């Protein structure tokens, strides 16, 4: 079965044309920023697809882990510059552990490499 926009999806993955943005998570009692939610965005240079489209296509072509791995890796690298002790919230597809290419411990290893303490990461 041909998946609509699959070619565009693969080009985005190949170019790694995804970047993170960070949404502040604010403590309503104090007004302090408690952490940041990592959200992925597409470099819209050559595509009309949205990030939500990518996750739908990834599911259809069996590449959810490949996409999620790219998003996590980019977020962790960028989070190296976050304020000390600020939490980093990562969104995770609950079914990802079922993916045969899923790598257990990936987030811990990439966080350590990026200098982000694992105790600051919330999934």
Regions found by a protein language model. Name each.
Residues 2-57:
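Active-site core of bacterial EAL-family cyclic-dinucleotide phosphodiesterase domains
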Residues 21, 62, 111:
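Short, flexible active-site loop motifs that bind/organize anionic cofactors or intermediates
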Residues 44, 57-62, 92-97:
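Conserved protein-kinase N-lobe ATP-binding Lys motif
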Residues 15-16, 60-61, 82-85:
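Structured helix-beta-strand junction loops
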Residues 65-123:
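Catalytic core of bacterial c-di-GMP phosphodiesterases, primarily the EAL and HD-GYP domains
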């Amino acid at each position: 079965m041909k998946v609509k926009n699959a070619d565009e999806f693969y080009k985005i993955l190949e170019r790694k044309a995804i970047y993170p943005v960070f949404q502040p998570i604010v403590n309503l009692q104090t007004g302090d920023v408690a952490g940041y939610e990592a959200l992925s965005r597409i470099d819209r240079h050559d595509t009309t697809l949205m990030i939500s489209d990518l996750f739908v296509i990834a599911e259809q072509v069996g590449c959810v882990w490949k996409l999620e791995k790219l998003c996590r890796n980019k977020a962790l690298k960028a989070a190296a510059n976050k304020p000390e002790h600020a939490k980093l919230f990562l969104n995770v597809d609950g079914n990802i552990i079922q993916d045969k290419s899923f790598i257990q411990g990936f987030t811990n290893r990439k966080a350590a490499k990026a200098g982000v303490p694992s105790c600051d990461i919330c999934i």
